[in-house]
Curated annotation (Swiss-Prot):
One GO term of the biological process aspect: positive regulation of DNA-templated transcription
Subunit and interaction comment: Binds DNA as a dimer.
Lineage: Bacteria, Pseudomonadati, Pseudomonadota, Gammaproteobacteria, Enterobacterales
Gene name, Swiss-Prot/TrEMBL: rhaS
Protein name as it appears in the record: HTH-type transcriptional activator RhaS
Gene Ontology cellular component terms for the protein in this record: cytoplasm
CDD domains according to UniProt: cupin_RhaR_RhaS-like_N
């Protein structure tokens, strides 16, 4: 597995923060690094496989990656993101207690992926741009300024994350996308889902298509197929059982959709013919 080292990304040995844009981010194999990062998705779509679990990412997705996490990008489509790198929560010169603002693992679950709305994303861009402008300065005032901006970024993300920001339809759509990540195997009635998140069905279709490039049902099918591919690689369950566990009532229909999406059959994936290294 590829290991990315801080010496290749931070401007100096005592720099606590670095900005690494990926405009665009192409498919990239599984890797980890000896630093932490906050991945901010500007626009486009892709699949982010984080510690073996696939997540669909779009504009407004924010991912918190620790130094022991492994991840990769695939099925990217005009995916543009900015990585805010930092060595460790306790490796800042002027800041302490940052862990309290970062996602915390509870009962083995790490809430790695957050979502923010478009207006917050604009504010995030401004903070990141200010950090980037000062990146080459190594004096103490510049270091302190960058760290203050980093703290402001964390505060903005925490205050604006889905759980606390439901005042407009874009935020409610983000919450709906997060809900689908947890309920992808359920039978989804789009009228009921639209009501649940206080969206009209027309608004749901329009905004989801704008955000992901897919219709709601196409998005749900892709999400189910990604989860199924993960189970094919990492479980001993039969193809039929996996199809049912991922929301498909007909295993033959599942196999047809799977091949159409990945150009491999479920059996091919199970046997590792796609070249994936487990």
């Amino acid at each position: 597995m590829t290991v990315l080292h801080s010496v290749d990304f931070f401007p100096s040995g005592n720099a606590s923060v670095a900005i690494e844009p990926r405009l665009p981010q192409a498919d990239f194999p599984e890797h980890h690094h000896d630093f932490h990062e906050i991945v901010i998705v500007e626009h486009g779509t892709g699949i982010h496989v984080f510690n073996g679990q696939p997540y669909t990412i779009t504009g407004g997705t924010v991912c918190f990656v620790r130094d022991h996490d492994r991840h990769l990008y695939e099925h990217t489509d005009n995916l543009c993101l900015t990585n805010v790198l930092y060595r460790s929560p306790d490796r800042f010169q002027f800041l302490a207690g940052l862990n309290q603002l970062l996602p915390q693992e509870q009962d083995g679950q790490y809430p790695s992926h957050w979502r923010v709305n478009h207006s917050v994303l604009q504010q995030v861009r401004q903070l990141v741009a200010q950090m980037e402008q000062q990146e080459e300065e190594n004096d103490l005032p510049s270091t302190a300024s960058r760290e203050i901006l980093f703290m402001q970024l964390l505060l903005l993300l925490r205050k604006s994350s889905l759980q606390e920001n439901l005042e407009n339809s874009a935020s409610r759509l983000n919450l709906l996308l997060a809900w689908l990540e947890d309920h992808f195997a359920d039978e989804v009635n789009w009228d009921a889902v639209a009501d649940q998140f206080s969206l009209s069905l027309r608004t749901l279709h329009r905004q989801l298509k704008q955000k992901t490039g897919l219709t709601p049902q196409r998005y749900l099918n892709r999400l189910r197929l990604m989860k199924a591919r993960h189970l094919l690689r990492h479980s001993e369950a039969s193809v039929t059982d996996i199809a049912y566990r991922c929301g498909f009532s007909d295993s033959n229909h599942f196999s047809t959709l799977f091949r159409r999406e990945f150009n491999w059959s479920p059996r091919d994936i199970r046997q590792g013919r796609d070249g994936f290294l487990q």
